[in-house]
Structure formats: C-alpha cells, structure tokens
Amino acid sequence: MDYRNQSLGALAIAIPRATKLFRQHQLDFCCGGKQTLLRAANKLNLDIDALEAQLSALQTEPHSSEDWQQQPLTNLISFIISRYHDRHREQLPELVLMAEKVERVHGEKPTCPRGLAAELSAILEELTQHMYKEEQILFPMIQRGMGSQASGPIFVMEAEHDAVGQQLDVVKQLTQNVTPPEGACNTWRALYTGINEFITDLMEHIHLENNLLFPRALRGE
C-alpha cells in the first residue's frame, strides 16, 4: 500500500490502531485528516519510512473493530452518541472540577496550568451545544435519508470541530503537552490522565464524523 500519499483520514479508516500511532506522533488525523501522510510528516520532521513500516505492521495485525464503512449510518450515529457524546458529557465536568482544584491549591507554583479550568469550561460549553445540534438537527436528517441535503449543517459542524481542535492546542500549551511536572499531586496527575483520555476520545470522535459519517451522508448512503 502506498501509505505516504494517502490522507491521514483514509489511513485512520483503513488501518486499525493507526489513530493511536498518529496521536503518538502528534499527527492530526481528525480535523487535519485530508492532508497526506507525507505532507504531515514533513511538517513535523518525522521519518516517513519509519512511519510507513509501523503502518504496515499494524495493517497485518488481526483486529475485531467494526467496519464503519459498511455499517448502516444509523448504527454509526448510535455508536457515536453512546461512545463519544455521552462519554464527553461525563468527562468534561469532572475535568473542570479537578482543574479548578489544582489551580486553587497550586496556583503559586510556576508549573501550575493557570487558565486551564477556564479553557476546559469553554470547551464543555461549546461542545455541549455542538453535540446538541448534531443530535437534534443533523443526525435526524441523516437518519431520514436526507444526508445529501445536509451540506450546510455539515459545513458548520466541521468548522466547529476545527474550533475545538484549536482549543485543545491551548490546553496542550497550558499543560506542557499534558505532562505533569515532577512532584505533582494525585489530583494533578489524575487531571492530566483524564485530559489525555478526553483528547484521544475526541480525536477519534471527530475522525468518525469528518472522515466517515459526513462523507457517506453527503453521498446519499
């Protein structure tokens, strides 16, 4: 397979666990899923040959994940809501509370991620509104077989995906790429573990929508 000239989104669809590899190398396969592996790797000065070897190894591994290219879109929508929307609604309020505690207790330390709670609160508010619009407007259109007429709502949802991606960049800057400092307390470490889990979930969530659900819906499937 010609990996280097494939888009990150296409590779994430075709190769199980490629998303984890991309995340390890800071390759944006969700909002930036249309760029080729070669272009994305060159931007980050990554070894393209090594990446291709890793992708080849992943492609030969047995896997049991769902083939969302073949599943009905109603099934994919149900999965997105239960696996990601509901999960984000659980994750974010707890992360905000932990961030507030860390800033309150450790605010005088130079390594304290001051402003993190406010940024997470903004993500919570905007993502809650975003998911509501998907569940109340866009997803019902797709479920009624009107996906090919949903280019307007899809454009808005993709723009909002880009916006939350920019917010995640701010979170990473505030947290030294979500790396707890030496001597961080248990709450601080739990916060960063939770943020990393949230970022992984959100990237997979956006990937499924941008690179699978929306294109299939626009094709009228």
UniProtKB/Swiss-Prot annotation:
Tell me the compartments it is located in. Cytoplasm
UniProt-listed CDD domains? Hr-like
Q: Name one GO cellular component term.
A: cytosol
- Please cite one Gene Ontology biological process associated with this protein: response to oxidative stress
GO function term, MF aspect, one? nitrite reductase activity
Q: What are the boundaries of the signal sequence?
A: none
Name the domain of life this protein comes from.
Answer: Bacteria
Instruction: Give the keywords, sorted.
Output: Cytoplasm, Iron, Metal-binding, Stress response
InterPro entries to which the protein is assigned, alphabetical: FeS-repair_YftE, Hemerythrin-like, RIC_family
Name the Gene3D superfamilies on file. nmb1532 protein domain like
Subunit-structure text: Homodimer.
What PANTHER family does UniProt report for this protein, alphabetically? IRON-SULFUR CLUSTER REPAIR PROTEIN YTFE
Q: Which protein family is it in? A: Belongs to the RIC family. YtfE subfamily.
Instruction: Provide the function of this protein.
Output: Di-iron-containing protein involved in the repair of iron-sulfur clusters damaged by oxidative and nitrosative stress conditions.
The name of this protein is: Iron-sulfur cluster repair protein YtfE
